Regions:
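Short amphipathic alpha-helical segments
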Residues: 79-80, 88-96, 104, 230, ...
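Extended, compositionally biased alpha-helical segments that mediate assembly or anchoring
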Residues: 440-454
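Extended, non-catalytic structural segments that build the interaction scaffolds
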Residues: 25-29, 33-52, 287-322, 338-363, ...
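Extended, helix-rich architectural segments
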Residues: 1-137, 452-454
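Short, basic interhelical loop/turn and adjoining N-cap
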Residues: 431-438
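Extended, charged amphipathic alpha-helical segments
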Residues: 196-345, 393-394, 401
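Short acidic alpha-helical/loop segments enriched in Asp/Glu that coordinate divalent cations
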Residues: 324-338, 367-388
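Extended, regular secondary-structure scaffolds
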Residues: 111-225
Length: 454
């Protein structure tokens, strides 16, 4: 991606990329993507270089966050339901949204904008035809231009596309002209930049999703809190702890201590310098006059299992206070790691914090859907209502398992709540019946504590 051209063009428009924010986002992204950082490069006592293992705890933590904000249904109302379902499927929204959830947890911010592909631009600045598409943007390709009460009303987005094997960098700038949006698209290819300006309407053509946790890092206005960046010391020490543990296991074979005088000689009886391989296999004790102890002897190291277990558990406990939702989220007990998605099923108090993030996700999806409907009405001649409520349903399977759900139905049925409908619902879930069968069972059979099959 030609970031220099993007930077130069934005500067010509009076916009400056926030280098401080981008450096933090990039560092968080490196840990999320399991890139080898400078902190992973080490030297042993013999000055042999080695690298700490990259355990991917940052990726795991971000994925765990994403699990709790998965969406299973978007309902924009009866009239637009089929259109939105097909549109989201064509734009791979489910897969891209999942990817964005992880990136948001790691880097703090993701975005999406609506555009027309292969459209025709008329002299009056309006466009006709084309396909409505979604463009998904990472934090490294996002610049908030105008922020009002933490609401981003104007922004720039950039990224790389490939057309017929050729890479192009696309910059899109959304600004307001009165109450209506103006979109400027700049394509940087092999030749001169190609710029196109079109006039849109009052509906915001983009949406930004940020970490719901307050961003306490000064100088990152408009960007969400990058949770991975805030926890880099913990992720590093987890890598270091596992690296030392793996080293213990690797070196649990016998170590041979050998005197420098026990070396190979060449044909002229000159000592051959020690190879790197020999330095890995032996520990040399110098060339001093050897005794029986220093000439050569072996030792069998122990694997410090209990010490590593306690260290890793402590690090995960600290991580629990800083990452995820609620309070205690991770533990390492009896050789097993309990993750946040497992823990949330036991602690409903975590829902309070989780719902804040779900509200952010709900607003993000709401903004995308309304923009898509406006584009469809304006450029495709449809007449979908833009003011209807858009319902977003999240996947709660991590929070309430099937057994708990059935028990709730059972208790409601026994108490008479909901009458025949609740009884049928319980039987349908319990015995995997269809609606008609469940209704007949509920009507024909008695429903008491001894006959409910539980």
């Amino acid at each position: 991606m030609d970031e220099k051209k993007v930077r130069s063009y934005l500067k010509s428009k009076g916009y400056e990329i926030n280098d401080f924010a981008q450096s933090i986002i990039s560092e968080a992204g490196d840990w999320y993507r399991l890139k080898e950082t400078g902190a992973h490069k080490k030297f042993n006592l013999n000055l042999q270089p080695y690298s700490l293992p990259r355990m991917g705890f940052a990726k795991r933590a971000a994925a765990d966050d994403a699990n709790l904000c998965e969406v299973i249904e978007i309902n924009p109302g009866e009239s637009a339901a089929a259109f939105i379902e097909d549109f989201m499927r064509d734009n791979q929204f489910t897969a891209q949204y999942r990817k964005q959830l992880e990136l948001m947890s790691a880097e703090g911010t993701v975005a999406c904008y609506v555009y027309l592909k292969d459209s025709e631009l008329y002299e009056d600045g309006f466009v006709r035809g084309g396909d409505i598409r979604l463009a998904y943007v990472e934090a490294t390709g996002f610049l908030p231009i105008t922020i009002e009460n933490d609401d981003i009303t104007e922004a720039a987005f950039w990224g790389e596309t490939i057309e017929k094997g050729k890479k192009k960098t696309v910059l899109v700038i959304f600004t307001l002209d009165g109450e209506n949006y103006v979109c400027e698209t700049v394509v940087f290819g092999e030749g001169a930049p190609e710029s196109t300006v079109i006039r849109l309407g009052p509906v915001k053509p983009f949406a930004v999703m940020r970490n719901a946790e307050v961003n306490s890092i000064a100088g990152m206005q408009g960007y969400g809190f990058p949770k991975v960046y805030a926890n880099i010391p913990l992720f590093y020490n987890l890598d270091a702890a596992f690296g030392a543990f793996f080293t213990d296991i690797e070196k649990s074979e016998a170590i041979t201590f050998i005197n420098e005088q026990l070396v190979d000689f060449d044909e002229d009886l000159k000592p051959i310098s020690q190879s790197d391989e020999r330095k890995k296999r032996f520990v040399f004790l110098g060339e001093g006059l050897p005794d029986s102890k220093t000439l050569i002897h072996n030792e069998q190291p122990n694997v410090r299992i209990e010490q590593f277990r306690k260290s890793i558990e402590l690090l995960l406990d600290i991580l629990s206070m800083k990452f995820g939702f609620g309070t205690k989220r991770y533990s390492f007990q009896n050789g097993q790691v309990q993750t946040a998605t497992e823990y949330i099923g036991e602690r409903q108090d975590m829902m309070l914090e989780l719902n804040k993030q779900r509200d952010e996700s709900r607003q993000y999806i709401d903004g995308i859907v309304r923009a898509v409907l406006w584009f469809s009405n304006t450029f495709k001649g449809t007449s979908f209502p833009l003011d209807d409520d858009i319902c977003v349903e999240f996947d709660d399977s991590y929070i309430e398992d099937r057994a708990s759900k059935l028990e709730n139905y059972r208790q409601d049925a026994l108490s008479g709540l909901g009458g025949m409908h609740t009884r049928a619902l319980y039987l349908q879930e319990m015995y995997n019946l269809d609606e008609d069968e469940a209704a007949k069972w509920a009507e024909d059979a008695g429903f008491d504590d001894d006959e409910d099959g539980a």
